[in-house]
Amino acid sequence: AYRRQRQMCIRDRRYRSPGGKLQGSSSNQRELREHPELALDYVTAPPRMALYMEYSRRIYATYLKYIAPEDIHVYSIDEVFLDVTSYLKTYGLTSEELARKMIQQVLHETGITATAGIGTNLYLAKIAMDIMAKHVEPDEDGVRIAKLNERSYREQLWNHRPLTDFWRVGRGYAKKLEENGLYTMGDIARCSAGSAQEFYNEELLYRLFGVNAELLIDHAWGWEPCTMEAIKNYKPSSNSVGSGQVLQCPYSYEKAGLIVREMTELLVLDLVDKDLVTNQIVLTVGYDIENLKQSEFQKNYRGEIKTDRYGRKIPKHAHGTMNLEEYTSSTRKIVDATVELYQRIVDPQLLVRRISLAANHVIQECEIAETDSYEQMDLFTDYQAKEEQKQREKEERERERSMQQAVLELKKKFGKNAVLKGMNLQEGATTIERNRQIGGHKA
């Protein structure tokens, strides 16, 4: 579609150019507008995540000149929430004036402009930026600022479509709402206010979404109970460390198993580097659409079939959990458990496209309780041999930990690809390329 559109643009420009011929090219809008003889061109810009992170750090440092860190929540590499309530009186500025001042300071120091959403709560600030600010005419510095409060939100956005434009409303939510005749935030708000005798009432939303309906109803009315203080004080009841990747082409069962081993070893090194241990591994493997394109295979396939977000038929993903005997960061134990889990849940006949791996219930290694263990003794167990076995396992763990630490030190000093295994050089292996990336993108 993009190629066809580009060809049409080139053809249209050729018709308008002097003599019907294009001479030279440009990707600059102003040059193209002033010189009809130039062909439309483009710039290929590979991602540079390390550079983006450096700019993100510099921008955050600029915000710190105005706002204390306890009033800033970094939402993503290019987005932050700021609670400026207590700063407006100090600076003698309105919220819009303070936002513009900070954005202009960022522009001066980094050359990057920004869009800002201002709201009476976190949700409205997010919606003001995501939906409203995009349609605001930028000033001479390219700055776009939009404001919302509960009243203006209802006046301006209760009839806005699609629902997926709103924060935390994905395709699944929107589809389920529309199947029940709810197409806008206004519809959801009115539904929540319905009486028990009506079809559209609060109970309908709770039947559809469970406890998540509470937040959906709040957002429909423009309310947000979460505050900056609540974000800063939040401590998750359970932590996890994980990674995932989308393979560049469909992988066979055997080749995907190689990727699972690679990912597991990298995950374990990450645990060791952070002094963490885990007692549970979770693996999710997504299959490729190519599996169902072969009519003969599709005829014989007896597994569950799902429809992806693009409307394509695809075998249901494989998902499983493996509980470990104890908290550990042992490469051998975790790799063995993950491989066993992979072999148990994945269909060997299917091609694989996505892999996600997580270590659940992670805690600091120092938190492992050193408690005495007790057992009923008998006359048939060689307790001396058993104690010797425990001692050998302890020594083995210590040797493995020393090797893990040595590998980490080498990688930190000489780069992530300084130490590799033979499997990392096999066809289809991805570790070397992923080590050159940050967050799945080119560094």
Please identify what each model-predicted range represents:
Residues 120-123, 218-221, 277-289, 351-364, ...:
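A glycine-rich phosphate-binding loop feature that marks nucleotide/adenosyl-phosphate handling sites
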Residues 1:
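Nucleotide/phosphate-binding catalytic cleft detector across ATP-hydrolyzing
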Residues 311-443:
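Acidic, metal-coordinating catalytic segment for phosphate/diphosphate chemistry
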Residues 4-7, 11-228, 384-443:
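Gly/Gly-Pro- and Ser/Thr-rich, intrinsically disordered tail segments characteristic of DNA damage-repair
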Residues 90, 124, 291-293, 365-367:
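Residue-level signal for secondary-structure boundary sites
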Residues 39, 165, 173-352, 371-372:
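DNA-contacting surface of Y-family translesion DNA polymerases
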Residues 89, 132-133, 242, 286, ...:
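Alpha-helix boundary/capping detector
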